Structure formats: structure tokens, C-alpha cells
């Protein structure tokens, strides 16, 4: 469901990474490497928010380069700082996301929002929300539509213990039918998600997890 080949990125004269390859189907994969290694840059490339210098990404079998609309239609992306439009409410964001995915804000998503403790926050504007509340809004959006890939940058950051427990359940459920690819330094969270842990050293050659 998530595949990338020969990804490289540099800023000016600094090489962030080069020649990265990976191929994985349903399941949780946690990217854990040292600070400054390029984890957020890689996740942004996989989500299509920045471009790689070389290489290609496929989401749900769709090329992010040549079929961007189709690729992004099967993607949920949760950046580290989940700021949508500052004056947009959480409910408006979720309704817009549902519309983009040809679905509606259904009882499943609203139940997840409630479990995240968002009942009193859905009608607040993003600029009024805390860091953790914004993140929970974005994570709730992962249940909307028929997405195949979830990419998340430090998804447990800013969440309290009860929200982390909800997130673990969410990721384990999503991983039954989708790829959940996230970065995290939190070994306990990664273990609770039953995620496979990889580093950049594991991305230097094709690693096939489809078996």
C-alpha cells in the first residue's frame, strides 16, 4: 500500500538522505532515528507536501508524481503540528475532509472524537485549540472514507495517557486493513501499537513487508 524507490533530498549543499527504498502492505511501521536525520522531511515527501529531488512514491498503487489526486485520495496525513486554517472549526475541517473523500462525518468518526474527548472542542476554531487537541482532530479524520495509507509525524506527541490509549486502539484497528507509517521516539507507544520499528539504515535497500 505504501512504496517508495530511490528517494533523495538535499537542502543547498546538505544531503538529507538519498537512495531510500521501502515497500509495505497493511500494518504499523514506526520510523525511529536520531534527531535531525530527516524523518519529518521523509514523511512530508511521502504525504506529497514537499517534493523529493529524485525518486517516486506510490500510495495505494497510485503514483504520487503522475496520479497525485488519486494517490492523495487514499491518504491520511497527520503532521507534527496539525494546524488547518486558523479560523476553521474542527467540525468544519472534518466535514470538508469527508466531502473530499466522498463520504460524510459519520457516527464512527464522531464516536472516535468523543473517545478523544473532543465533544466540547469540535466547534472551536483551530486557533483556539491546544496542540494536542488539533492533533486529535486530524487523527479523527483518519477514519473518514476508504483511505489506504496513514502517515503521521510523532502522533502521540502532546497527548495525555487516555488519548494515547485511544490512539493505540485506532492504529491497531487501522493497521488491519491499511498501512500506518509513523515516526516516534516513544518505545512504549511503538510497542503498544505492535509496530515494526525501522531506521534510515533499513531504507537503503528494498525491504518488502508484503509477506
Language-model regions, residue ranges each:
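ABC ATPase C-loop
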Residues: 143-144
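Helix-to-loop junction immediately C-terminal to a conserved catalytic motif
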Residues: 47
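Conserved ABC ATPase "signature" region
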Residues: 95, 106-121
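Catalytic Walker B motif of ABC-type/P-loop ATPase nucleotide-binding domains
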Residues: 150-154
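Conserved ABC transporter NBD signature motif
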Residues: 55-66, 70-71
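A short, flexible loop at the N-terminus of ABC-type nucleotide-binding domains that lies
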Residues: 1-26, 68
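Hydrophobic anchor residue at the start of the ABC signature
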Residues: 139-140
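Q-loop/switch helix immediately C-terminal to the Walker
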Residues: 81, 86-102
Amino acid at each position: 500500500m505504501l512504496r517508495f524507490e530511490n528517494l533523495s533530498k538535499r537542502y543547498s549543499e546538505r544531503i538529507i538522505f538519498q537512495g531510500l527504498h521501502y515497500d509495505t502492505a497493511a500494518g504499523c511501521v514506526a520510523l525511529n532515528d536520531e534527531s535531525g536525520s530527516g524523518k519529518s522531511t521523509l514523511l512530508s515527501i511521502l504525504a506529497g507536501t514537499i517534493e523529493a529531488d529524485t525518486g517516486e512514491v506510490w500510495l495505494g498503487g497510485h503514483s504520487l508524481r503522475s496520479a497525485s489526486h488519486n494517490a492523495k485520495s487514499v491518504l491520511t496525513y497527520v503532521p507534527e503540528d496539525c494546524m488547518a486554517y486558523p479560523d476553521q472549526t474542527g467540525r468544519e475541517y472534518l466535514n470538508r475532509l469527508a466531502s473530499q473523500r466522498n463520504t460524510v462525518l459519520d457516527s464512527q468518526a464522531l464516536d472516535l472524537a468523543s473517545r478523544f474527548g473532543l465533544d466540547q472542542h469540535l466547534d472551536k476554531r483551530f486557533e483556539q485549540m491546544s496542540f494536542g487537541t488539533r492533533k486529535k482532530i486530524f487523527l479523527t479524520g483518519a477514519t473518514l472514507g476508504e483511505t489506504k495509507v496513514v502517515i503521521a509525524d510523532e502522533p502521540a506527541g502532546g497527548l495525555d495517557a487516555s488519548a494515547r490509549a485511544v490512539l493505540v486502539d485506532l492504529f491497531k484497528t487501522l493497521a488491519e486493513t491499511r498501512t500506518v507509517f509513523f515516526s516516534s521516539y516513544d518505545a512504549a507507544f511503538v510497542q503498544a501499537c505492535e509496530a515494526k520499528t525501522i531506521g534510515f539504515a533499513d531504507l537503503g535497500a528494498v525491504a518488502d513487508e508484503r509477506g
